[in-house]
Amino acid sequence: MAHTVKIYDNCIGCTQCVRACPLDVLEMVPWDGCKAGQMASAPRTEDCVGCKRCETACPTDFLSIRVYLGGETTRSMGLAY
């Protein structure tokens, strides 16, 4: 089952989430918004099994990456008012 993976702009480009993902759902892409010059991207969300290892690996105080499981609403994702 595919899950929604949202990557926020406070990503520091550390690659921890990419290395933690057992299914290679994530990859790094160029981005000028941080010192590392890259940020995580989730091009293969159809392979996401919702293990949330990427969330656990994220070192930022406010998670840069979130996995929203199938039953979670768009309101919990911050996509609705």
From Swiss-Prot:
Keyword Cell membrane: no
Catalytic activity entry: reduced [plastocyanin] + hnu + oxidized [2Fe-2S]-[ferredoxin] = oxidized [plastocyanin] + reduced [2Fe-2S]-[ferredoxin]
GO terms, molecular function: 4 iron, 4 sulfur cluster binding; electron transfer activity; metal ion binding; oxidoreductase activity
Group of enzyme by EC: oxidoreductase
Cofactor remark from the record: Binds 2 [4Fe-4S] clusters. Cluster 2 is most probably the spectroscopically characterized electron acceptor FA and cluster 1 is most probably FB.
E.C. number: 1.97.1.12
Pfam family, one: Fer4_7
Protein's job: Apoprotein for the two 4Fe-4S centers FA and FB of photosystem I (PSI); essential for photochemical activity. FB is the terminal electron acceptor of PSI, donating electrons to ferredoxin. The C-terminus interacts with PsaA/B/D and helps assemble the protein into the PSI complex. Required for binding of PsaD and PsaE to PSI. PSI is a plastocyanin/cytochrome c6-ferredoxin oxidoreductase, converting photonic excitation into a charge separation, which transfers an electron from the donor P700 chlorophyll pair to the spectroscopically characterized acceptors A0, A1, FX, FA and FB in turn.
Subunit structure: The eukaryotic PSI reaction center is composed of at least 11 subunits.
Protein name: Photosystem I iron-sulfur center
Organism: Cyanidioschyzon merolae (strain NIES-3377 / 10D)
Lineage of source species: Eukaryota, Rhodophyta, Bangiophyceae, Cyanidiales, Cyanidiaceae
